[in-house]
Amino acid sequence: MRWISKYCWFLGLMIVSFMIGGLSATEAGPKQTVMAKTTPTQKPSLLSAFFGLDDSLPFIANLLCLGAWDKDGIPVVFSHTVNPDSLQTEDFQVLTRGGGVATPLCVTLRPASDVGETRTVLLIGEFGNAVSDPPVIVRIVGDLFSDGAVGRPLNFSGLETVVTPLNAGPALVLAEVIPESNWSQSTPGTDCPRKSKQVVRVTWAGGVRLADGEEPGDTERELYRITLRYPDGSKEDVVPFALGDLGDRDNNHHLCLDSQIPAYAVSFPSGHLVDPNGDFNPDTWVQVVDVSDL
């Protein structure tokens, strides 16, 4: 059935291996550019919390979390990769517009599990109602640490971020240059070609696909714009010659470049990719982070 296909996609974006057939997408709304709040910094932060589905996780979600069927899903993106051993449900609180406070039923880092990707945590539970009492804040209330992959381990405790509403489309929240040693994927996602000279990972607030449920292709590749910045300060916009990290159902894409000029920013135009709720992306822009700056 159509609704099963749609919601299995959402789970598939957050759980490796579940596939989707079709998806019914809503129409693109008025144009606006969503500027990611990411800047190179050593301080921990929450980059986004995205209300993905409301009371709609499918029955198969019980394989991940007993009782997840018909619950809500909120992916939260962190500034640094997370230490999975410190990840607990009680680390999180979700506040609703009406003043309710909820603790997730369960949390998971899957399926974004390649090196450098483990910064998206999916919260599953009852987090209000999209119409009458939507979730508005995600807060870290326990000792949740980064994994120290870049710099020393950092504590996210005390941080919070506003929840993107259910009917808003997904935006870019992070772009980072990937060290060449990490270009190869450990999961089923596709790799950038060996002739790549630079690879930029972009992270979306939630899972994104085409409106028909398929992965992005050459058309979408040509819509990505990477701004390169030369040593003299001049800039040039280029298009990636290939896309990587496709087919693994997470919220990351790899932009494969044939230039070694440092990438400065990434943008993507509105109305081409949809989230699990069928909402189209807005115009979106994010500055590129070099992991050596973190």
Residue ranges of predicted features:
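Bacterial N-terminal signal peptides
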Residues: 10-20
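Bacterial N-terminal signal peptides that target proteins for export
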Residues: 2-11
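Non-catalytic beta-sheet/beta-sandwich ligand-binding modules that flank or precede catalytic cores
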Residues: 25-294
